[in-house]
Amino acid sequence: MQDKDCFTTENTIYIHDPPREVELFLIRFQQVYVIRYAKANGHKIPMPAEQTFTDHKILSLEEIGNRVRSWRKESRKLVFTNGCFDILHSGHVRYLQTAAGFGDILVLGLNSDSSVRKLKGPLRPIMTQADRAYLLSAIEAIDCIVIFDEETPARLIQSVSPDVLVKGGDYLPEDVVGYDTVTENGGCVKIVPYVEGKSTSGIVNSILEQS
């Protein structure tokens, strides 16, 4: 690449199937973004060589079931939220911190790459599910991450049966996927407004405009 600050290679903008050097730049961009945000807010994120703690946060559906049973025995209040989290930004982090404040344990359902494509089209996600999960696992507010392939987290919500289901945006609680599952078990649904001016689409458009 001729310019570290743009997504161009030989004056060509790659929107789909970028060359490996562009992919590596995107990954590094994401890592630097998260680390700088964390430092600015007084958090410590270890560099990759130190990040042995992250793997244990990423669980399979079977593993989350075992973990939930353990937390229930400890009378922990479980919170669940979900999303794509493609190009992590400060709005995501604030949202997750707010969600974590509703209980003791925050379980994050992360849309897989195939799930994101179904929801947002063939040009997404920008970051792979492995990269997204790795970066999210460095956020202290998140206790565990489960990647799911479906378009909605309905099956995962049934497995976790959270005390609090959190959704970002301007939904009515009863319109949120999992509402019936949670409320029938005595739980509740919380709606957290999005942070104005913070979005993955906005970041991508800004980068392309400057390239």
Predicted regions, residues:
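Intrinsically disordered, low-complexity segments enriched in proline/serine/threonine
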Residues: R20-E21, V164
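Leucine-biased recognition of intrinsically disordered, low-complexity hydrophobic segments
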Residues: L24-L26
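Nucleotidyltransferase catalytic core that binds NTPs
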Residues: V32-S211
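Short, low-complexity, charge-dense intrinsically disordered segments
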Residues: E10-P19, R28-Y33, N41
